[in-house]
Amino acid sequence: MERTEVLKPRTLADLIRVLHQLFAGEEINVEEVQAVMEAYESNPAEWAVYAKFDQYRYTRNLVDQGNGKFNLMILCWGEGHGSSIHDHTDSHCFLKMLQGNLKETLFAWPDKKSNEMIKKSERILRENQCAYINDSIGLHRVENISHTEPAVSLHLYSPPFDTCHAFDQRTGHKNKVIMTFHSKFGIKTPFTTSGSLENN
């Protein structure tokens, strides 16, 4: 059947083409998108042009704008880099490991009181694994806990967003954060000093 071929993108360009097909309609089939992203086997020769690292923080590098339906980006995590605890602004978030490992820690939404946030689970995501989260599942923090190996991950957000909330683990208090891109389509963007969710 033609459908099974669609689920096996052979290249990053092929994956992007299939994603455009999957997001052409109004409804999103989460399982299908996740299966397609997981089926793509990471090939550094295809994505290295987008993988722009920063010495001090993880970076967000835009790969494709998905006709306004989604943003596809590559995140580059140096040794020890991590995000804060954050939400996803009512968007679908798919994460696929391209290189290395990342630790994902899931948190419950904080209550109105000023209390330490409750950790729900944690896991290690390994090369070619895919994960999914949305705000109904909870909040998460993503970190490269290796001190010797960088990590690279492919993220799809639908619908795209440019602000989200970062949370203080000790109090549950949140701050609005404007998200920026370190590079777009393989070209470094100016003024990227703000707007990542790094741990402070």
UniProtKB/Swiss-Prot annotation:
Cofactor(s) required, per the database record: Fe cation; Ni(2+); Zn(2+)
Family: Belongs to the cysteine dioxygenase family.
Purpose: Catalyzes the oxidation of cysteine to cysteine sulfinic acid with addition of molecular dioxygen.
Alphabetized PANTHER family for the sequence: CYSTEINE DIOXYGENASE, CYSTEINE DIOXYGENASE TYPE 1
Catalytic activity: L-cysteine + O2 = 3-sulfino-L-alanine + H(+)
Name of the protein this chain belongs to: Cysteine dioxygenase type 1
Gene Ontology molecular function: cysteine dioxygenase activity; ferrous iron binding; nickel cation binding; zinc ion binding
Residue positions binding Fe cation: 86, 88, 140
Pathway(s) it belongs to: Organosulfur biosynthesis; taurine biosynthesis; hypotaurine from L-cysteine: step 1/2
GO BP, one annotated term: taurine biosynthetic process
Binding partners and assembly: Monomer.
Keyword line: Dioxygenase, Iron, Metal-binding, Oxidoreductase, Thioether bond
The keyword Oxidoreductase belongs to this UniProt entry's keyword annotation: yes
Gene field: CDO1
CC per GO annotation: cytosol
CDD domains, per database record: cupin_CDO
